[in-house]
Amino acid sequence: LHSTSRRQRQMCIRDRVYGIAKMLNFAHGDVIMVGSYVVYVAVSGMGLNPILAILLSIIICTLMGVVIEGVAYRPLRNAASPLAVLITAIGVSYLLQNVALLIWGADTKSFSNVISLPSLKLAGGSIVITGVTIVTIIGGILIMAGLMLFISKTKTGQAMLAVSEDKGAAQLMGINVNKTISITFAIGSGLAAIAGVLLCSAYPSLTPYTGAMPGIKAFVAAVFGGIGSIPGAFIGGVVLGILEIFGKAYISSQMADAIVFGVLIVVLVVKPTGILGKNIQEKV
């Protein structure tokens, strides 16, 4: 349940970034990792209150998202080949991993839960749902609803929608495209910090590669649900999370990742646009 709801949240964030910037931010999982390390250092090393540590993580990750977009992605936004941006995104991901490796080393960092909540026991105690899982599920639903309301009800959200539909037309209407995309990355990276906190609360161990696989699986779920669709991303996260859980329970825990990526191949062959994705033909 926890992995399912966490993936929902990652999907909604990554989907919105792609829909507006028209690029896959493969460094998103590594921003989650950085946010987790910030909380680890703040709580275990500096002795900060967990709430202050979470706020510090959100601020740092938000600023990091803006810097990454401005330095690494913006100069290549109008590149002749979309592969240039894709390769840069992968490069940023490896850069963040190796910087974390230099600073904190390869050893696994363990620490006490940042979020400590009572568990919910069902069926006479035979089914136990941890407090972190409950918070993650509710948080995923609230974030999806909040993003949809933000996009539909605010001027900034409407600007994001306009940029995602047609950057050129949006610019002609007076929308600052660069600012809009920067705001998108800021929001996505800030929420990634929250994802990092919840991830470390559920699995209190940390390495420089903590965010790599969750980030890739988030991309798979986004493709499954339909890139560019927030509800589709949410559904994709739920379905893939359930498939992964049942795969571990009834097939093999070692095959769980293979099942996820097998679903990606099937979706790309059968319905490349995903469950709720739209087949949009771009005019050249």
Predicted regions and their residues:
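Hydrophobic core segments of alpha-helical transmembrane domains in multi-pass membrane transport
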Residues: 36-40, 58-64, 92-100, 139-148, ...
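Alpha-helical transmembrane segments within multi-pass membrane transporters and channels
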Residues: 47-92, 99, 235-240, 271
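Short, non-helical or kinked segments that cap or interrupt transmembrane helices
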Residues: 16-36, 50, 79-84, 156-159, ...
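Membrane-embedded helix boundary and interhelical linker motif in transport proteins
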Residues: 20-67, 71, 226
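Helix-loop-helix "hairpin" substructures at the membrane interface of multi-pass membrane proteins
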Residues: 126-206, 230-236
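Single conserved hydrophobic/aromatic residue that forms the stacking wall/gate
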Residues: 1-9, 13
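Transmembrane alpha-helical segments in multi-pass inner-membrane proteins
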Residues: 47-59, 185-192, 198, 202-262
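Transmembrane helix-bundle core of multi-pass membrane transporters
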Residues: 75-76, 82-153, 180, 246, ...
